[in-house]
């Protein structure tokens, strides 16, 4: 049977066909919220079990058929989950199966958890574990799939299998070029003309764009923001789950860190605009410290000991600097370009906070080599 787009009424039968559900009739509801795909939650009527079904459409969901997109992008997500399950299974949802014909992924139901962005927008906090676990997640995945953690032949095969030209092109355009050009995806007004014509900024973004296109360091999540993280508690213990790695490919490690940092900094701008006391400002530091500590913990297991400890110090310094640049680019994109953040758009007056965040994004891009510590970045927030 060829590819078919699932509707709500099809899902229960589909799960039975795939051996994921019994004869009882579940409750099925569509909960699609992201830009790209359809998502269904399937729950037993007595509440004893549940599954989630995510299907890639042949177009971008929020745009419809006018923006076609191969549903094979779901293959990259399935491969990413397979890799993460080897090194950080506690930080992703349980995967029950992937159907490559229909580009549909069946996972655990995480409706007992909440999307991190939603919690933050409603005035909540990150808590003590979230950013630490995100830093560990990036370190564990990136070390294991880098030249330090994976044999050369295996890594070359991973690079080839993880090539994702359509989705990488989206990032190259939407994050790393369109915000600095006249483009239909942008939200420009006359006050931004000087920003767009800034030659230094454009050159620095071009450097980041080239790094994104050529820096095949490790397997990335590729879209690591506060909307792709769910948090909560289970059995009294904190839970952090990273999901939606469909933009996964082998690229520069700093891109994943940078996307997360951008979102934490924008959430800090929201909290400041609302006068909310919270733990927003220290999240970059917490995630970086955890990333660096976990990468160093894994370092003695590297497959090539020619890379010595002094090299590791230099390597981590480069990752830090590149992460800042990508963070700045993501902040700029989320304000000027495609897919704005509700962190800012739901403010009573989003303009002042957006303007401050935009200037912060520029500083992170053009001054990334000067900002050598989390404290330097935190000073920019004052």
Sequence positions of predicted segments:
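Activation segment
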Residues: 58, 112, 240, 248-250, ...
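Conserved short submotifs of the Hanks-type protein kinase catalytic core
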Residues: 102-114
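Conserved NTP-binding catalytic cores of kinases and kinase-like/nucleotidyltransferase enzymes
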Residues: 1-103, 232-240, 368, 375-382
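Active-site activation/catalytic loop segments of kinase-like enzymes and analogous catalytic loops
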Residues: 254-303, 327-344
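ATP/Mg2+ or Mg2+-diphosphate-binding catalytic cores
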Residues: 310-382
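Active-site acidic catalytic loop and adjacent metal/ATP-binding pocket
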Residues: 29-47, 51-52, 203-255
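Short acidic, glycine/proline-rich loop/turn micro-motifs
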Residues: 62-67, 117-121, 271-274
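ATP-dependent phospho-/nucleotidyl transfer catalytic cores
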Residues: 72, 115-221, 232-234, 238
């Amino acid at each position: 049977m060829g590819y078919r787009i699932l509707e709500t009424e099809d899902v229960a039968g589909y799960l039975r066909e795939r051996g994921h559900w019994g004869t009882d009739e579940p409750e099925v509801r569509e909960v699609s919220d992201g830009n790209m795909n359809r998502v269904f939650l399937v729950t037993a009527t007595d509440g004893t079990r549940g599954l989630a079904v995510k299907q890639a459409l042949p177009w971008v969901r929020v745009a419809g058929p006018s923006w076609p997109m191969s549903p094979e992008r779901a293959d990259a997500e399935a491969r990413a989950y397979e890799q993460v399950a080897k090194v950080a299974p506690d930080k992703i949802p349980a995967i029950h199966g992937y159907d490559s014909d229909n580009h549909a992924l069946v996972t655990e139901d995480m409706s007992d958890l909440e999307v991190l962005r939603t919690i933050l927008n409603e005035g909540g906090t990150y808590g003590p574990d979230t950013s630490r676990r995100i830093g560990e997640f990036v370190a564990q995945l990136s070390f294991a799939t880098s030249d330090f953690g994976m044999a050369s032949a295996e890594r070359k095969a991973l690079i080839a299998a993880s090539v994702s030209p359509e989705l990488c092109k989206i990032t190259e355009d939407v994050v790393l070029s369109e915000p600095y050009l006249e483009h239909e995806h942008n939200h420009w007004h006359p006050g931004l003309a000087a920003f767009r014509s800034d030659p230094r900024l454009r050159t620095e973004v071009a450097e980041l764009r080239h790094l994104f296109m050529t820096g095949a360091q490790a397997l990335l999540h590729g879209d690591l923001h506060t909307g792709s993280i769910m948090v909560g508690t289970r059995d009294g213990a904190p839970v952090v789950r990273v999901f939606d790695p469909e933009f996964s490919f082998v690229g520069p490690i700093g891109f994943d860190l940078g996307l997360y940092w951008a979102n934490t900094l924008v959430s800090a701008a929201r909290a400041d605009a609302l006068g909310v006391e919270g733990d927003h400002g220290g999240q970059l530091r917490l995630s970086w410290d955890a990333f660096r500590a976990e990468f160093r913990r894994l370092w003695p297991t590297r497959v090539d000991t020619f890379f010595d400890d002094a090299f590791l110090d230099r390597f981590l310094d480069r990752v830090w600097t590149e992460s800042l640049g990508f963070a700045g680019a993501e902040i700029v994109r989320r304000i000027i370009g495609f897919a704005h953040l509700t962190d800012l758009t739901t403010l009573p007056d989003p303009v002042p906070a957006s303007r401050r965040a935009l200037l912060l994004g520029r500083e992170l891009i053009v001054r990334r080599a000067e900002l050598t510590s989390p404290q330097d970045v935190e000073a920019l927030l004052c």
